[in-house]
Amino acid sequence: MTDAPILVTGGAGFIGSNLIDALLAQGHQVRVLDDLSTGKRSNLPDDSRLQFIEGSVADASLVERAVDGCRAVVHLAAVASVQASVDDPVGTHQSNFIGTLNVCEAMRRAGVRRVLFASSAAVYGNNGDGGAVDEDTPKAPLTPYAADKLASEHYLEFYRRRHGLEPAIFRFFNIYGPRQDPSSPYSGVISIFTERAQKGLPISVFGDGEQTRDFFYVADLVSILQQALDVPVVEEGAVNVGLNHATSLNQLLADIGAVSGGLPPVKHLPARLGDIRHSCANNARLLQRYRMPPATEMREGLARLLSS
């Protein structure tokens, strides 16, 4: 099925659309399943090799139709918001867990084996203590979003053992880059901060700003996902996707100011329930399994984002 399409769920979103550009450039056929709740049809190119299906991964029959005839699946679709999962755990569970189960079942029935899954560093909770967490760090999900991601990982490994699926599970840390919509309530901190800096609007920081994140540029992630589609064997076990480098929000703001020529006023608000204090990836397994491209440095990535 070398000419068969690659299905990307959530493909109209930030990460998915960047991946699709790269897949089309490689000559692949691509199929997208996206309900456009946060993704945008305008993120996708007008290309005869791209088939778009509008709908949710929570719709089992639609997922079955989308998976049929594909050679692999990249499962990115999710309600990617900690706060949304806290406010509506039942609703977000449909996309964030039931959607994964629907993908697994559709793949089993269609005989499709390779699946790339976007899990999250949120599965570790606050177990980092400021240091880099490896994949064996005890899991302590603090929110329904994190719990759904961890449960999805377990189901994917079950389908590996029982039905021969080949899941490549990636625990994304903080991915950023072009097309990350700053107006979305689910957007990442970098896109929100950079947009407000460009417009001269005050920037709100929850807490003291010394909380840290491991930021990873989207083009570097796309390179890894492309490799994972084609490696002969997908080894068992999730893989952290990060740089093993922690950046505080205060340092991030300083970098944005340096790249954009200045910062508007910064207002500190009370820390939010469920927010993780420190998050940094031990990426030894990533470097062992995949060819890591030269990492995009923060200020270079910010400059690309600001000019996009």
How would you describe each model-predicted region?
Residues 107, 160, 197, 205, ...:
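Hydrophobic pocket-lining residues that define ligand/cofactor binding sites across diverse proteins
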Residues 218, 250-251, 269-294, 300, ...:
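Conserved C-terminal active-site "lid" loop/helix of NAD(P)H-dependent oxidoreductases
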Residues 62, 102-106, 215, 220-223, ...:
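Conserved mid-core alpha-helix of short-chain dehydrogenase/reductase
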Residues 1-173:
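N-terminal Rossmann-like NAD(P)+-binding domain of SDR-like oxidoreductases, especially those catalyzing
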Residues 151, 155, 159, 189, ...:
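Hydrophobic alpha-helix immediately C-terminal to the catalytic Tyr-X-X-X-Lys motif of short-chain
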Residues 150, 175-191, 201, 206, ...:
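Glycine/proline-rich active-site loop of Rossmann-fold NAD(P)-dependent oxidoreductases
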